[in-house]
Amino acid sequence: MKQTLWPLTRLTSLVLTAVFVSTLSAQPRVIETATHRFVEAQAGVWLGTGSGSVYTMSNVMVLVGKNDTLVVDSHVTPTAARALLDALPALTDKPIRYLVNSHYHFDHAHGNQAFPAGIEIIGHEYTRQKLNGEAGDVLEENTFRSFSDPVALTVANLERLAAAETNIDRRSRLQERLKVQREYLAAIAEVQPTPPNI
């Protein structure tokens, strides 16, 4: 029996080693910028998340084609969208031709206005109607207000916490969060909903 198990154990060990080695080589490419972390899901298909230095709120997808680039969603504010645009050269030198709005909510489409003139913004007809005001003012809807209205209180709370904190490291982290939230509060005022154009 021992002689039968030994080859089986060796075979199992070899298979597990091969699987382990193949997973090491299959690790996705990751590119980090000052504002974003991009993970390549497939060749030319990137998932982008904010690094925390700018309030982005939502993820983005970037598809790099043969001649140009398509971006899915534009983040929560023009400031966050500009940070994304500044980060994209780390992925590609191909121009952005398309921006796709997955839907009209503020955290996916309120960065549209920061994208270069001439790009095609693609979205559902309802997204266009919501962002151009035909179907109500998105800046007055509960979806937007429930997230944007409390930001001033968040800033005040962080100011109070940072001022009272005696631990230097914790105070530094609070001050960084405060900086990001202050910038987000200022960026909210800049939002001008910009609808899809195709």
Identify the function of each model-found stretch.
Residues 1-8:
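N-terminal secretory signal peptides that target proteins for export/translocation
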Residues 10-23:
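Bacterial N-terminal signal peptides
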Residues 24-28:
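Boundary at the C-terminal end of the N-terminal hydrophobic targeting segment
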Residues 29-39:
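Blade/loop signatures of beta-propeller domains
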Residues 30-32, 54-56, 190-192, 197-198:
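Short solvent-exposed loop/turn micro-motifs enriched in small/polar/acidic residues
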Residues 33, 42, 115-116:
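Short, well-ordered coil/turn elements that cap or connect secondary structure elements
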Residues 37-90:
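Conserved beta-strand hairpin/beta-sheet module of binuclear metal-dependent hydrolase folds
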Residues 80-82, 86-197:
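Active-site HxH/HxHxD metal-binding segment of metal-dependent hydrolases
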